[in-house]
Amino acid sequence: MDQRKPPATEEGWYALHDCRSIDWDAWREAPQRVRDRALSEGIGFLDAYEAVEDADEGQTAVYTVMGHKADIMILHLRPTMGDLDAAERHFEQTEFAAFTEQEFSYVSVTEASGYTEKSREYFEGEVDDDSGLAQYIQARLHPDVPDEEFVCFYPMSKRRQPDQNWYDTSFEERAAHIKRHGDIGRGYGSEVSQMIAGSIGFDDWEWGITLWSDDMRHIKELLTEMRFDPSTSQFAEFGPFYVGRKFDPSELPAVLAGQRVPTDDASVPETPADVAEHEHAPADAGASHSHAEEPTASGAQTGAHAGGDTDSHGGTHPGSASEGDHPHSEESSDEDDSGSSSSSGGRPDVSADFEEIDDAAQRLGRLGLHEGDAYDAGDYALVFHSSADAEDIVDDVSDLESNFDHYDRHVQTAVRADSGQTYVVSIWTAKDAAETAAGFLKDIDGVDEQLGGSLGEGVEGSETADDSDAQAAESSQSIRETLESAGVYAGQPHGEDVYALVVYSEANAETLDEEVTDLRSAFERYDTHVQTTVYGDTDGDVAAVASLWDTEDAAQTASDYLTDLPGVVGRHGEGDGFGTMGMFYTVKPEYHEDFVEKFDTVGGLLKEMDGHRETSLLFNHDDENDMFIASQWDSQKDAMAFFRSDDFSETVDWGRDVLADRPRHVFLA
């Protein structure tokens, strides 16, 4: 048999149809705080990809999916397969992804083939690039996802049976089939849009077909007519069909609430972040932005995508100021121009009535926030004192922080405690952004003293940060070498050290255990997670949550979630001193009491040592033989004096017989 002639083809954008189901049971059981964060991250992901912040060009859209096969479908079109690969894995890093399961996916590339006489002229280079035909083919290869309400996606292949083998037919016969098939499709051109993507070698079928229409009956009528065409009846095989409806990322809360979408804003369920916006952040009448509408408190775009650093395709680049400088700013109506601050509109009072100070960096240092770790030189900080207890305002501040995070000039906002006093700290890369944030922070319960100041100069600050980092690394290495010489590591390589975070909480044990159980389930999705445990003292006065990670980056990311736990009053070891040495011990059950007595003895010695602040023995709520010791010191010199002492060496030697596992020592400074 003669070799059959394949058609010429040209490829355009790569396509990924990512179909996911929602774990509805897990969603219903999740705490509201977790659901709010998941929605915020889901909206943020979809907004960023619809704005094509990740590539030079492309398209992204999201749809509900009806039936049992999936609940949502995310469609990505990008110039390279690498873009699709990154997008798929990026989604998995969001909190929202934890509530989804990928039920089906399809990888393909938009395709135009040279079966018709006109298209063959294009492939043979006989038409100008600006001709109507060339522009039509390019539009097929780089399509705009239409705004039609309904989508229908399905994969298909050409039949390869002995008496019905598409690939054994002549080029002329195939071309005749394609022409007749195309004539049917053109008859529905005003009612149905299509995207044809080839997938030979990419996926299990040979093509992926995507159809859009404002009336699903038009798609049904089109496909019904095509089924009776010989090109389909004799040669087509079809995979599963996925039918859904397009929705805006901002409507993700409505989708998860079981509401009808598209929907107007009034019917979208409110999250605490939305409530915070209504109470603290009316529209910014005085702001001037490059687009008509700005992000809402949930991070969604109510109109065009946020502008700013846009490229020729209208997409924004990561790290640009595309979402505007002012937290919660939205387009306002004419009657808002008066500056009223009612819930119906108008800009809140952001007159920057805080006192300017010169020692902002020193104040942050006393609160455990240092240049290079918490901020960069040249940033601007607000430090507001509150007479309220930290645990009473942590939720409100967390809600505002979630809103602020949608603006790229925000660094961080958090509650800090020092010597029994409560502070709200908000750091921004520019003073004008901080001034606007002040208008919202001043409404936090109990706020009285309001201070703000620059955090040094950029160039000088970077040198200081480098020196600080070098000193910290030197300190850590020195102490680790001392511990190793005492045999603490029992031969374990330094590369197996873990990074630990500890937060203190005043919440009751039952509440804290429930919250940490939910958080631990989320952390366990990551290979870098070692353990997250609740520890408490025998009197029940102190509770700590310790989270251990294989990498420092993972620990830093986890810290944001730990501070969201109820009743958090500060991160242990943050302050103006050297910090905390954290020691994790698993004791053999028969030596439990002996270990506690030994700790009491060593604790008495520590009280007499210069520079010692506090050392606490805490027990795992689930296993009393799993213990955590937190030892805080004023300086490296003070800590080294103890770790080099004979008393410490004797304690280490004694511990070899009573410990069920090797001790784990980590620095929390």
UniProtKB/Swiss-Prot annotation:
UniProt entry tagged with the keyword Metal-binding: yes
Residues covered by region (Disordered): 260-351, 451-477
Alphabetically ordered keywords of this record: Heme, Iron, Metal-binding
Domain of life: Archaea
ABM domain location: 579-667
Pfam family, one: Chlor_dismutase
Gene Ontology terms, MF aspect: heme binding; metal ion binding; oxidoreductase activity
Residues that coordinate or bind heme: 181
Transmembrane intervals: none
Family designation: In the N-terminal section; belongs to the ChdC family.
NCBIfam families xref list: PRK09565.1 (NF007124), PRK12276.1 (NF008913)
Database matches in PANTHER family: COPROHEME DECARBOXYLASE, HEME-DEPENDENT PEROXIDASE YWFI-RELATED
Name assigned to this protein: Putative heme-binding protein rrnAC3100
Organism whose genome encodes this protein: Haloarcula marismortui (strain ATCC 43049 / DSM 3752 / JCM 8966 / VKM B-1809)
